[in-house]
Amino acid sequence: MTENIHKHRILILDFGSQYTQLVARRVRELGVYCELWAWDVTEAQIRDFNPSGIILSGGPESTTEENSPRAPQYVFEAGVPVFGVCYGMQTMAMQLGGHVEASNEREFGYAQVEVVNDSALVRGIEDALTADGKPLLDVWMSHGDKVTAIPSDFITVASTESCPFAIMANEEKRFYGVQFHPEVTHTRQGMRMLERFVRDICQCEALWTPAKIIDDAVARIREQVGDDKVILGLSGGVDSSVTAMLLHRAIGKNLTCVFVDNGLLRLNEAEQVLDMFGDHFGLNIVHVPAEDRFLSALAGENDPEAKRKIIGRVFVEVFDEEALKLEDVKWLAQGTIYPDVIESAASATGKAHVIKSHHNVGGLPKEMKMGLVEPLKELFKDEVRKIGLELGLPYDMLYRHPFPGPGLGVRVLGEVKKEYCDLLRRADAIFIEELRKADLYDKVSQAFTVFLPVRSVGVMGDGRKYDWVVSLRAVETIDFMTAHWAHLPYDFLGRVSNRIINEVNGISRVVYDISGKPPATIEWE
């Protein structure tokens, strides 16, 4: 019997902060399981989850507004430690008898807080000392409102000149509030504070580790599917690859992977996927060459969203046809990860907007009554990668830059043609190869090449040529919500440009995209 890795668990209530998922990832990094729920949960749901502790996230609302979100009152009656972050601290203060006011000055960015009273949350944690020996902490603030009176049974733990209650605590009830964000790296001791809360105050053991997660996933897959057969759409991306490896470990030859080669992959990618999973790891793979079918469906279509939908639809059609050829398949596996689950929940509550549609195996034939196996649905992307390493997948594959589901279909601007894809594949391979050679690949968050359907005059030897243009794109980002264009060295860009123009017959000009996000998106389509 595998160990219960969910035994100790933290509940994070989401009040809408852009950093909330980061809080959850930090708790997981400490080896403790946690879940992220909307703030308006019921007492019954909290009782059922039975958390070892509760974290109240930050949020964009103002607690001074009449209908702003509040923590369920049961949070403060459950008898477990509670940690309020930013908005979470303000709603805690207000709900327990303190007072919050809108401030004239918004405090955003670096601040230094002075610890004025002892507390289990920050005992022995400091960045510097004042002249009279008081601990100082370097933190990241982001708030407009501030607590002006703490509840009567709380003490002030730390303050700044403009924020008299930067940390408050009720040690007896183990309630803590901080007016800054411990989850961001700018708060230098933030991880130690979270560790103090999760591991010491909530007394959670570090049971959530890659090896134990794998054992748990394998046991759950076996329990769910037994001796039944399972089908998986394998793309070669991180999520489907790790899903394939987990299922292979759990059920061996009862897994069939369908690899649809849509003609929109990177250079030699199809061969690499088949070699690695088929020849090296011994998975049972059905290879479906479908380039002509995808390109025919895309012919004449210029609209990016329409292209995404076509690629998604044709993939489902091809996958369904292959699934129908297999006998006795009872289960469909998918590489759904935890942020997908959170996104779906947000959509259900009307709190998320779709900027670009994502495609997955969306529909299965009505006659196929299949169950769903989603072994990664509790995991964040960084956890999926760590598990992949533990399962023996190569680092370069797990940590390569994101590649869109529709592939080159949205990196060829406008109509997608085989000629354009072939040129783009070769140009992109040169860019990535040079990034790796210059030790720049891991210093940027994402880099790729875009095919522009415009011709430009060039000179080759004594002759003129009139060929296509490609754009190089490289960005630096923490969360992909915002991004800066990467300041790559000019001599490096010159080398890449020369190689592409000289080695890829059909491209006459290379440009570099210097747009940030916002206003531009990272992908061009």
Swiss-Prot record:
Pathway per the UniProt entry? Purine metabolism; GMP biosynthesis; GMP from XMP (L-Gln route): step 1/1
Tell me what induces its expression. Activated by cAMP receptor protein (CRP). Repressed by DnaA.
Q: Which reaction does it catalyse?
A: XMP + L-glutamine + ATP + H2O = GMP + L-glutamate + AMP + diphosphate + 2 H(+)
Residues the entry annotates as binding ATP: S235, G236, G237, V238, D239, S240, S241
Q: Which UniProt keywords apply?
A: ATP-binding, Glutamine amidotransferase, GMP biosynthesis, Ligase, Nucleotide-binding, Purine biosynthesis
For this protein, the record's NCBIfam families field holds: guaA_Cterm, guaA_Nterm, PRK00074.1
Any idea what this protein is called? GMP synthase [glutamine-hydrolyzing]
Q: Which gene encodes it?
A: guaA
